[in-house]
Swiss-Prot record:
Record lineage: Bacteria, Bacillati, Bacillota, Bacilli, Bacillales
Domain notes: Contains two domains, a large N-terminal domain encoding a serine protease homologous to subtilisin and a smaller C-terminal domain that possesses unusual sequence features. The C-terminal third of the protein is not required for protease activity but is required for swarming.
Post-translational modification: May undergo two steps of processing in its passage through the cell membrane: removal of the N-terminal signal sequence and cleavage of the C-terminal domain. Several active forms of Epr with molecular masses between 40 and 34 kDa were found in the medium of B.subtilis cultures. The size variation of the active forms expressed by the complete epr gene appears to be the result of partial removal of the C-terminus either by processing or degradation.
Gene: epr
Modulation of this protein's activity: Requires Ca(2+) for stability. Activity is inhibited by phenylmethylsulfonyl fluoride (PMSF) and EDTA.
Record-given protein name: Minor extracellular protease Epr
GO cellular component: extracellular region
Induction data: Expression is sigma D-dependent. Expression is positively regulated by DegU, and very low levels of DegU-P are required for epr maximal expression. Negatively regulated jointly by ScoC (Hpr) and SinR, which bind to their respective target sites 62 bp apart. Spo0A positively regulates epr expression by negating the repressive effect of corepressors, SinR and ScoC (Hpr). Spo0A binds to the upstream region of epr promoter and in turn occludes the binding site of one of the corepressor, SinR.
Keyword Hydrolase: yes
Top enzyme category: hydrolase
Length: 645
């Protein structure tokens, strides 16, 4: 913490007690006043715009126009049949009960303030379940939000007339925003929903005061920009029909509104807009879970939350402590964000019902005027323990990087209901799996480099294919390609050598295929020359065999020639030799047919003569035949001949 003499405690007076409502004195003429005119239809709106009134503000989602007008113009507008009603532009103030006390400027990141308020609401259990308010949009309608290292502001809007900036010039809005969403960065404070998208909607001025016109503008902006939750740590003691209509409109559009009950003390009526049924009214509790002395109570109070001595972010990178239902309200708004993250599809009604399951009942049993349904307190669900187990498994996988631990974590994650928390766990595990995949690929490439077998190469290639495109994949593929080239070269050499030895066509074809896979090189050229010699030898052998068969047309020579021709690769030479050999085969076949006819004649003669001489002659003719069905038949006939004695 930055050293301060006598421990600097600066009081910044922000609190303005809730004022008795009346017309604002902003008009230049005492006969003029600021009013909100609510119209029934388009004609009513045109009537307002065409009147003598000065238009201050038009709204996108509210049928109203804020104007400054004299009494006569206001009277005319009230009497117009297309005008629904006219209301005075009344004032609002921030709902603080004490002055802020500045603690530190936060320049020393070792600052880590005590936050008693987190324990009663058990929010750490929600964090363990992965609930951080991620993707939930929260509008803080307040004095704006000041830039702070402990805050992330998603955007904002200024509804006040004196500046277009939504930067906080009071401190109240920044304090509220920190309670909701201060970062979990190891210093300062921890917000209840640190990953919620916080929007600064400036409707209060540097004194913490505002008016109905600006508040309506803030609500209108929240509807237009699809806020999930609106925090209103402000209020007034008088009812407003247009404000009531505005919050109802927002509620119907799916915006959950949370507001401070007020700081007028027990027994005083709940302030507006918290008093409306479409708004969640929040009272404040102290360190002893008792009602804060300043907290307004009433039937409208729905929940209570810590609101005394709350430390949060402040102007100029400082931190400060403050008390009020202003501080209690953001506790509830942030808790709603956690519940909304857990069940994004739930309606406002369902969320309010769900919050009733996440309370500890204080005071009279059931709902009462002081605490409503009770103090908000996160209740762990069965899914929380499942999430915790999955997260623990992911942590183990992150530490060990073992595939068995990765698989176990993935199985546990798969059993979780769909949520941002589940997606976050998946992303963490995907990083571990990516690391593991790279390591596996490196190990398998190294193994392929060592053993240089096709199996190790195939295994390494499969591992590389799992990697995303990038430097690791590119470098590993280069290394594996070198191994592939080595193996391809060795295979080509071995196959060429085998072809040289066997001269078989299958070996020659295999060698040719292996050579074809090699990149152009002197080695490839040399291997091709060696293989071409084998092909030339086979061609010469086939040519000689065919010539021999042509010279002496025997079955044996024809068969030998056919075997030699079969070893040749397809081409003109093989085709020409096969044609020559086919002629030889026809000649051999003709000679064989002649022998068959001769044998048939002699067998027939032996059957007729039945002499030993004719049978011997027939047997000699049959013996000269090639094995065939015809030869078998002739032999059976001859065997049946019994020579005469």
């Amino acid at each position: 913490m930055k050293n301060m003499s006598c421990k600097l405690v600066v009081s910044v007076t922000l609190f303005f007690s809730f004022l008795t409502i009346g017309p604002l004195a902003h008009a230049q003429n005492s006969s003029e006043k600021e009013v909100i005119v609510v119209y029934k239809n388009k004609a009513g709106k045109e009537t307002i715009l065409d009147s003598d009134a000065d238009v201050e503000q038009q709204y996108k989602h509210l049928p109203a126009v804020a104007v400054t007008a004299d009494q006569e113009t206001v009277k005319e507008l009230k009497q117009d049949p297309d005008i629904l009603y006219v209301e005075n532009n009344v004032s609002f103030t921030a709902a603080d009960s004490t002055d802020f006390k500045v603690l530190s400027d936060g320049t020393d990141t070792s600052d880590n303030f005590e936050q008693w308020n987190l324990e009663p609401i058990q929010v750490k259990q929600a964090w363990k379940a992965g609930l951080t308010g991620k993707n939930i949009k929260i509008a803080v309608i307040d004095s704006g939000i000041s830039p702070h290292d402990d805050l992330s502001i998603a955007g904002g809007y200024s509804a006040v007339s004196y500046t277009s900036s939504y930067k906080d010039d009071n401190g109240h809005g920044t304090h509220v925003a920190g309670i909701i969403g201060a970062k979990h960065n190891g210093y300062g404070i921890d917000g209840i929903a640190p990953e919620a998208q916080i929007y600064a909607v400036k409707a209060l001025d540097q004194n913490g005061s505002g008016d109905l016109q600006s508040l309506l503008q803030g609500i209108d902006w929240s509807i237009a920009n699809r806020m999930d939750i609106v925090n209103m740590s402000l209020g007034t003691t008088s009812d407003s029909k247009i404000l009531h209509d505005a919050v109802n409109k927002a509620y119907e559009q799916g915006v959950l509104l949370v507001a401070a009950s007020g700081n007028d003390g027990n027994g005083k009526p709940v302030n507006y807009p918290a008093a409306y049924s479409s708004v969640v009214a929040v009272s404040a509790t102290n360190e002893k879970n008792q009602l804060a002395s300043f907290s307004t109570t009433g039937d409208e109070v729905e929940f209570s939350a810590p609101g005394t001595n709350i430390t949060s972010t402040y102007l100029n990178q400082y931190y400060a402590t403050g008390s009020g239902t202003s501080q209690a309200t953001p506790h509830a708004a942030a808790m709603f964000a956690l519940l909304k993250q857990r069940d994004p599809a739930e309606t406002n009604v369902q969320l309010r019902e769900e919050m009733r399951k996440n309370i500890v009942d204080l005071g009279t049993a059931g709902r009462d005027q002081q605490f409503g349904y009770g103090l908000i307190q996160y209740k762990a669900q069965a899914t929380d323990s499942a999430y915790a187990a999955a997260e623990q498994a992911v942590k183990k996988a992150e530490q060990t990087k073992a595939q068995i631990d990765i698989n176990k974590a993935r199985e546990l994650i798969s059993q979780l209901p769909n949520s941002d928390a589940k997606t976050a766990l998946h992303k963490r595990l995907d990083k571990v799996q990516s690391y593991r995949n790279v390591k596996d690929a490196k190990d398998k490439v190294a193994k392929a480099e060592k053993y240089k077998t096709q199996q190790t190469v195939d295994t390494a290639q499969t591992a590389i294919n799992k990697l995303p495109n990038g430097t690791d994949k590119k470098n590993l593929q280069k290394r594996l390609d070198q191994v592939k080239r080595y193996i391809a070269s060795k295979q080509a050499k071995d196959k060429v050598a085998k072809a040289e030895k066997s001269k078989k066509k299958t070996d020659v074809d295999s060698a040719q295929s292996a050579i074809g896979k090699l990149p152009a090189s002197s080695e490839k050229t040399s291997l091709q020359k060696r293989l071409n010699k084998v092909k030339s030898t086979n061609l010469k052998t086939a040519q000689q065999s065919v010539s021999a068969a042509e010279k002496k047309s025997t079955d044996a020579n024809a068969a030998k020639a056919q075997s030699a021709v079969n070893q040749l690769q397809a081409g003109k030479d093989k085709t020409a030799l096969q044609k020559r050999l086919d002629k030889v085969k026809k000649k051999v076949a003709a000679a064989e047919a002649k022998k068959v006819e001769t044998a048939k004649a002699k067998v027939k003669k032996a059957e007729k003569d039945k002499t030993k001489k004719s049978k011997t002659s027939a047997q000699s003719a049959v013996n000269q035949l090639k094995a065939s069905n015809e030869k078998t038949k002739l032999q059976k006939r001859l065997n049946a001949v019994k020579p005469k004695k």
